C-alpha cells in the first residue's frame, strides 16, 4: 500500500510503500535482498515529523474520532446543503466531501460555462475565510481531522452563504 503526505499531515514531504511479510518474504526469497532506503529517500527530518504525527494521531484518537464522531456529524451537516436550490448533490466519505452545483435542482442541466459557478463559489468562500477547491462546478472540501463541531457548523453556515452569493451571481 502506498502512502504520502498524510503521514506527516503535509508539514514535510514524505511518501512510502508498506508491504506485508508475505510480499517482503517473496522478494527476499527470490532476490536475496529487499533494497530500500536510498540516499534520496528517508529524509531524517521528514521521517521525524511522520513519527511525531503518527504518535499524535494515535494519542489523540483522531482516526477513531473522525470515524465515529466528527465524521458523521460533518456528513449530516454537509448533506443539509442539498436543500439549497443550486446544489444537485452532496457526498462525503470520512471528512472528504464534494458538492455539485447546478442551475436547477432535479434537472440534468448543467451551467453553460462549465466551472464558472465553481470558481464563483470558490472566490466567495476564500473571501469569507473558507478554503474549498472548485473542480469544474463541483466544490471539494477536506477539513483537518482536528475540526470541532463548532467549526463544522461554521463551515456549513459559510458554505450556505457562499451558495446564496453564487446563486445571485449566476442568475444576473
Regions found by a protein language model. Name each.
Residues 1-172:
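Conserved N-terminal phosphate-binding loop of PLP-dependent enzymes in the Aspartate aminotransferase
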Amino acid at each position: 500500500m502506498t502512502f504520502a503526505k498524510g503521514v506527516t499531515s503535509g508539514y514535510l514531504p514524505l511518501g512510502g510503500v508498506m508491504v506485508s511479510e508475505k510480499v517482503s518474504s517473496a522478494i527476499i526469497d527470490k532476490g536475496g535482498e529487499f533494497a530500500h532506503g536510498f540516499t534520496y529517500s528517508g529524509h531524517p527530518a521528514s521521517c521525524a515529523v511522520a513519527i511525531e504525527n503518527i504518535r499524535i494521531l494515535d494519542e489523540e484518537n483522531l482516526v477513531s474520532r473522525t470515524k465515529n464522531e466528527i465524521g458523521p456529524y460533518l456528513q449530516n451537516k454537509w448533506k443539509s446543503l442539498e436543500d439549497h436550490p443550486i446544489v444537485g448533490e452532496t457526498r462525503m466519505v470520512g471528512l472528504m466531501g464534494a458538492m455539485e452545483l447546478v442551475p436547477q435542482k432535479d434537472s440534468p442541466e448543467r451551467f453553460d460555462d462549465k466551472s464558472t459557478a465553481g470558481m464563483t463559489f470558490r472566490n466567495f468562500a476564500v473571501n469569507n475565510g473558507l478554503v474549498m477547491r472548485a473542480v469544474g462546478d463541483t466544490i471539494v472540501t477536506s477539513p483537518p481531522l482536528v475540526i470541532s463541531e463548532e467549526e463544522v457548523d461554521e463551515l456549513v453556515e459559510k458554505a450556505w452563504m457562499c451558495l446564496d452569493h453564487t446563486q445571485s451571481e449566476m442568475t444576473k
